[in-house]
Amino acid sequence: MSNATTSTTIRPEEAAHFGRLAAEWWDPKGSSAMLHRLNPVRLGFVRAAIDAHWGTDSRGIRPLAGKRALDVGCGAGLLCEPLARLGAQVTGVDAAQENIAAASAHAAGGGLAIDYRCGEIGALALTGFDLVTSLEVIEHVADKAAFIAALAVALAPGGLMILSTPNRTAQSKLLMVEAAERIGLVPRGTHHWDDFITPEELRELLAGAGMAMGELRGIGFSPMKGLHLSDDLALNYIVTAQRA
């Protein structure tokens, strides 16, 4: 298994796009409003996966105490900060320096010690993490196989990986790209439907890196429930993975 390189995973135009959004990342009514709506749903899945993997009490407030967590494509820290509050020693990696600056400032303001790094996951040679997460990221990278391989290298034996990404379906194209950008739910240029991957494709990418996909849940939307975990995979999905 080879490490990814800067030229194979980071798309400069993607890093620049998200870097321009850094100043509004923590504004729930700003350009990242959809992420703020999505984050509680993702966090619910992440917490349940942590408890299932390590047998921790769902009522406990620090189930990751003594564990190292890595979030790749961390943006300004929307996942890193909750992981730190769950007790983890957290490292966040992002390709945009503007995001790392915003993340560091926000964490400092909240009294959280999070190790933020700007760069490409393979080039940073990070290893030994009990939990590796990368949510809504793989659809933005240049070489998906190299990216998954680098995530696998970072994972410690017995560790847990959690990934989420939009599915490549007619429904996701209509709602997540065309409609969402047209009415301003996400900034234009955020999503490129051809880069979305199906669960089957992700399963194959994980297998190529020596990983086995575990739990698979959809993230759906309805007017009554809003965004929620679902058996419907048509829009977005979130998965666990472990070493095969």
Give the ranges of each region predicted by the language model.
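N-terminal, positively charged/glycine-rich alpha-helical extensions of SAM-dependent methyltransferases
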Residues: 1-32
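Conserved alpha-helix/loop element of class I SAM-dependent methyltransferases that forms part
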Residues: 37-65
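Conserved hydrophobic residues forming the short capping helix/wall of the S-adenosyl-L-methionine
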Residues: 50, 54, 107, 206
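Conserved SAM-binding loop
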Residues: 57-62, 67-171, 199-202, 239-243
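Acceptor-substrate binding/catalytic loop of class I
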Residues: 165, 184-201
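Short, flexible, mixed-charge acidic loops at enzyme active sites
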Residues: 172-182
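Short alpha-helix
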Residues: 194-210, 216
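Core SAM-dependent methyltransferase catalytic element
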Residues: 227-244
